[in-house]
């Protein structure tokens, strides 16, 4: 494959094991330390990259307060081998934050404003709760449906509009746990999980190299027994078909194709296009549809050209309408989230965009695909998507 000098390539990807936010493995680990551990280990693994060459550390994080405040990108960077002469910024696009971090780095590389970037994101939802310090504008209900800030209710709305049944959602949730468990047993996550010290349920320090969020004993019967989580009267969305509240971080090394060639590095993939899009906040989960369509058009591709898709599983009631309207629902078992998704692994907000993108690249590497799309919905009505080509 012929690459242009300013093409944007992904050199490597790593993530923490995903930990439960309530009493999980990361309960005594700070968000900056999780982030710094990933950055340091990924740079050690890629010793041809001089940390002094890093132009900027771009880190996604949604709730930027407490230990995640005051520019956590810089806080984490200062704990690593990256010198003080490199810069750092924290970005938020809610659920799409670390994919936005990737896009920001890519745009800088494309415009010759740097060659080497470290991107990723973190969310410690056990230490910094989802609503900590949040004060929504009461006048917002004049401009968008009042329930638009309640993600579970927007999923209920989207599922109802598209005729998604409770049974379909339960089957999708079961699939996520089964595939994530299978991927774990077969070592499919080995290249992406960077082991970390944490604490087990008995309080003993140990090294974790697996996700503690996966429930291999999940059954359709156990899912069917769960009560609706957001709409008790007639709702279909449950805790078992929603993304888990978890703690985690993800990281990528991104650079220009020219710099990768100069360093003798074989990249994982090249970015072919990027896009963001807005939708009605009341159906925020639909955002991946226009974002993906826009990204495909920019890449000169159609959905039929795409070998693998990683779609963030915010809710089964949201994911299924997206797959239906992207016309891949009938190809789901061959193309979509082959290692499970956020229903099994969790959705630490700032982490997820880079996490699903990196998982996609590993799926492509392991299965020989050429083109892949990572995409996700975003609270209050947005979508974001990236098209990759395996190098």
Swiss-Prot record:
It is found in: Cytoplasm. It comes from the Bacteria. Gene3D superfamilies: 3.40.47.10. GO terms for biological process: fatty acid beta-oxidation; phenylacetate catabolic process. PANTHER family: 3-KETOACYL-COA THIOLASE FADA, 3-KETOACYL-COA THIOLASE, PEROXISOMAL. The active site is at 95 (acyl-thioester intermediate), 347 (proton acceptor), 377 (proton acceptor). It comes from Pseudomonas savastanoi pv. phaseolicola (strain 1448A / Race 6) (Pseudomonas syringae pv. phaseolicola (strain 1448A / Race 6)). Transmembrane segments: none annotated. This is 3-ketoacyl-CoA thiolase. Catalyzes the final step of fatty acid oxidation in which acetyl-CoA is released and the CoA ester of a fatty acid two carbons shorter is formed. Keywords: Acyltransferase, Cytoplasm, Fatty acid metabolism, Lipid degradation, Lipid metabolism, Transferase. One of its GO terms (cellular component) is cytoplasm. The gene is fadA. Pathway: Lipid metabolism; fatty acid beta-oxidation. Heterotetramer of two alpha chains (FadB) and two beta chains (FadA). Its main location: cytoplasm. It catalyses: an acyl-CoA + acetyl-CoA = a 3-oxoacyl-CoA + CoA. Its EC number is 2.3.1.16. GO terms for molecular function: acetyl-CoA C-acyltransferase activity.
């Amino acid at each position: 494959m012929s690459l242009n000098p300013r093409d944007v390539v992904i050199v490597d990807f790593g993530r923490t094991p995903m930990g439960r936010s309530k009493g999980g493995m990361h309960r005594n680990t700070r968000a900056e330390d999780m982030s710094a551990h990933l950055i340091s280990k990924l740079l050690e693994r890629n010793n041809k990259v001089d940390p002094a060459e890093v132009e900027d550390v771009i880190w996604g994080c949604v709730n930027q307060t407490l230990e995640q405040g005051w520019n956590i990108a810089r806080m984490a960077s200062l704990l690593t081998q990256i010198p003080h002469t490199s810069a750092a910024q924290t970005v938020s696009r809610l659920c799409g934050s670390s994919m936005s971090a990737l896009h920001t780095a890519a745009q800088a590389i494309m415009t010759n404003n740097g060659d080497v970037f470290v991107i990723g994101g973190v969310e410690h939802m056990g230490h910094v709760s989802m609503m900590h310090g949040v004060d929504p504008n009461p006048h917002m209900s004049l401009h968008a449906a009042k329930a638009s800030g309640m993600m579970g209710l927007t999923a209920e709305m989207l599922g109802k509009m598209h005729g998604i049944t409770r049974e379909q959602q339960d089957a999708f949730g079961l699939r996520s746990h089964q595939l994530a468990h299978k991927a774990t047993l077969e070592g499919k996550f080995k290249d992406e999980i960077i082991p970390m010290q944490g604490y087990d349920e008995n309080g003993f320090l140990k090294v974790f190299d697996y996700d503690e969020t996966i429930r291999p004993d999940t059954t359709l019967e156990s899912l069917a027994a769960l009560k609706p989580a957001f709409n008790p009267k007639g709702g279909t969305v449950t805790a078992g078909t929603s993304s888990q509240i978890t703690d985690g971080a993800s990281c990528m090394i991104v650079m220009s194709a020219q710099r990768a060639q100069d360093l003798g590095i074989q990249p994982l993939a090249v970015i072919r296009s990027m896009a963001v899009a807005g939708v009605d906040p009341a159906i925020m989960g639909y955002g991946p549809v226009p974002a993906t369509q826009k990204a495909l058009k920019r890449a000169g591709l159609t959905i039929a050209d795409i070998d693998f898709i990683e779609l963030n599983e915010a809710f089964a009631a949201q994911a299924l309408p997206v797959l239906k309207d992207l016309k891949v629902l009938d190809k789901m078992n061959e193309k979509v989230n082959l290692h499970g998704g956020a229903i099994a692994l969790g959705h630490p907000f700032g982490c997820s965009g880079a996490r699903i993108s990196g998982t996609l690249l590993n799926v492509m590497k392991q299965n020989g695909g050429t083109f892949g799309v990572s995409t996700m919905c975003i609270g209050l009505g947005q979508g974001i998507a990236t098209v990759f080509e395996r190098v």
